[in-house]
Amino acid sequence: MNETLLKCTTRHVRIFTARVENNDLVPDPDQLTLDLDPDNEFLWTESVIKEIQQRFAELVASHAGGELSDYNLRKIGSELEGTIRKLLQAGKLSYNPECRVLNYSMGLPRTPELL
């Protein structure tokens, strides 16, 4: 019987109940895989990526022992979106001027002229 792949997809976060093998997602109910900013809307530093990964690990740990459902994955994804917004507002993260579509999905950049 094939395993069901659960997923959460938000604007900047994708979470799958899968592992990556040869660039393919293989369903795995015991593992969550995080795909961060698939459209490359932001410029990421290693420290910001680590901060997101740490928050992801905290959220997963807080749901340990609970039901693995679409709803719980969406809660984790929404929390990560909020973390991304906070990082952007704090100036730790910035929009990528080279992205395919620059739509400022999390609000206009904070610049001295706009403050």
From Swiss-Prot:
Its EC number is 7.1.1.-. One of its GO terms (cellular component) is plasma membrane-derived thylakoid membrane. It is a peripheral membrane protein. It catalyses: a plastoquinone + NADH + (n+1) H(+)(in) = a plastoquinol + NAD(+) + n H(+)(out); a plastoquinone + NADPH + (n+1) H(+)(in) = a plastoquinol + NADP(+) + n H(+)(out). Pfam families: NdhM. It is found in: Cellular thylakoid membrane. One of its GO terms (molecular function) is quinone binding. Coiled coil: none annotated. Keywords: Membrane, NAD, NADP, Plastoquinone, Quinone, Thylakoid, Translocase, Transport. It is an enzyme of class 7 (translocase). NDH-1 shuttles electrons from an unknown electron donor, via FMN and iron-sulfur (Fe-S) centers, to quinones in the respiratory and/or the photosynthetic chain. The immediate electron acceptor for the enzyme in this species is believed to be plastoquinone. Couples the redox reaction to proton translocation, and thus conserves the redox energy in a proton gradient. Cyanobacterial NDH-1 also plays a role in inorganic carbon-concentration. NDH-1 can be composed of about 15 different subunits; different subcomplexes with different compositions have been identified which probably have different functions. HAMAP family: NDH1_NDH1M. This is NAD(P)H-quinone oxidoreductase subunit M.
